[in-house]
């Protein structure tokens, strides 16, 4: 049924109201991100993702073609062109492909046939080589010294270890391989000129020498430095030339060899050695970082050891009144310290001015100890509570340390404790101070010979014990040396006395010889009976000689005394000798 029929049935006007417009569908434009993200997947699958974008962009891999503008360009021609390499000296001509430039294109021949064009192309192929090879800039030649003449070699470069032929061979290899010493050492094989055996039958054939890389370098650097000095004297050289000359002249082959050996050892280390070296480096770094703290603490400790210098004025204590006032002040301070220790920490607080102590306060240590039980009985409940708490606590076990643990934690058991604060460095310093300055100097000299400082840098317990043992041994050595020197001096004195005694005895014997001979002549002239009675015995002759020697020792020769005019002193050895002989005579 149409709408007009309905209007007729309901008696409605035919066109009473305008027909409503049809509602148009509004299509929202999707953002570009959705379009880009939905590429490669279907619309339904992309709609399932919702508002959340995929974590990974889904793109289809496809070939990226050339831009459209490149397809419109014409293909550029290439041609085979000849070239020569400047590094070669034989003039070899090679060919390579090269893009043909617009200027190199031959102009088109108007009205020419195809055959003429082909001939022109063939003729253009035989082009001249390029003027400069593009890769010739990488052909860098090292700067080598110019070749020496015979006169220069004989005057400046002659060597006992290197011949002229071997030197020329080395310089040729250096020029050929461009100072690449690894290649030069590998290719080095100098063969000396063979000697004609028929012409020189007695000639000595030199042994083949194997040159190391360091020897080759040393020889080349010496030649290069000498030739540089001949061309430019050191006074006319530039700074760069002078530095190069100094480096070449100071080349040390032994040091270079040691450096390479050390580098080889470093490269051939095992993993354990590398790990150990790393640990040592870390320890060294830690010690270096803490060194400043150690120095500060050590300086602080040394400053405490030094006696502070008094800066106060002491003129007021130079009189008797000032000394008595100082004594009263010290006594008052001592009493206040004792009172503070007796009253406990409560009395340490300052009392208000004008407050007097109460009558029931204890005035002495005995009273305070007598009052202690009464104060303790005032609170029995607190005592019971403390007893119960102590009963609940488990008994504390005392751990006994082993000797290793005592050494580790520094636990010591002293037989006798000295009052006051002492440092180990002070105790070690007192060991080097003897009763006399001479002994102290001897101790210091002995420590200097042993290269031990008199003040220990790190006076630990073990170091102080070893230092004390060392000082004791040095003192024993010095005492033994002193006794030895004393005995040696006594031996020298006794030897001198013995020599003096022997000399005097010899002089006495020499003086008594002519008198003995005259007596023997007189006795021979007398009769046989008189000779037996008158001839002196050997003992009597010895006694007479001893008496004469004593007289000569006691009363020097008058003639010599008169000539010299000087009275000679008698030595102790002579007196002792004379007294011994006189006693012997009396006994006989």
Swiss-Prot record:
Keywords: Activator, Chromatin regulator, DNA damage, DNA repair, Nucleus, Transcription, Transcription regulation. Residues 353-365 have a biased composition (Polar residues). The keyword DNA repair applies. Gene3D superfamilies: Homeodomain-like (1.10.10.60). It comes from Aspergillus fumigatus (strain ATCC MYA-4609 / CBS 101355 / FGSC A1100 / Af293) (Neosartorya fumigata). InterPro entries: DAMP1_SANT-like, SANT/Myb, Swc4/Dmap1. It holds the Pfam family SANT_DAMP1_like. It is found in: Nucleus. Residues 1-10, 498-520, 538-548 have a biased composition (Basic and acidic residues). This is SWR1-complex protein 4. Belongs to the SWC4 family. Component of the SWR1 complex which mediates the ATP-dependent exchange of histone H2A for the H2A variant HZT1 leading to transcriptional regulation of selected genes by chromatin remodeling. Component of the NuA4 histone acetyltransferase complex which is involved in transcriptional activation of selected genes principally by acetylation of nucleosomal histone H4 and H2A. The NuA4 complex is also involved in DNA repair. The gene is swc4. GO terms for biological process: chromatin remodeling; DNA repair; negative regulation of transcription by RNA polymerase II. Residues 1-40, 345-403, 498-588 are annotated as: Disordered. Residues 154-224 form the SANT domain. GO terms for molecular function: transcription corepressor activity. Component of the SWR1 chromatin-remodeling complex and of the NuA4 histone acetyltransferase complex. Residues 373-392, 524-535 have a biased composition (Low complexity). One of its GO terms (cellular component) is NuA4 histone acetyltransferase complex.
